[in-house]
Amino acid sequence: PPLDAIQKLIDADKDIITGLTTSRLDESVLAFWKNGYPEQDQKREFLKNSPEIVEIDGAGLYLTLIKRPVLEKILFNWNSIVDDAEFYIRARVLGYKIFMHQGILCKHFRDKENYYLPKI
């Protein structure tokens, strides 16, 4: 992510805000959803016609800033395969809005051998 990513998220002053993230396996895939699970071309069109900070339904939790009161109210299920989606669903059920900052692009880190995690 850009060096000022965290500061941009703080400055947005939202309860829950994330950067624009890509899929782990295919960086051309935008990892967020709005009004269901739109196709990639629909996501790009939505973003093109939206302000820099846009309300979404959910995304990956790669670079997400969450205010403490939100975390204190939401029980996070770490064992879920879709823990990020589940977190956003729980937040929305409690009435929280989720925002995404288009000016922050975050990709998964990979080492020179294209591994996501250290070899054991």
Residue ranges and their predicted role:
Residues 2-79:
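Conserved catalytic core of nucleotide-sugar-dependent glycosyltransferases
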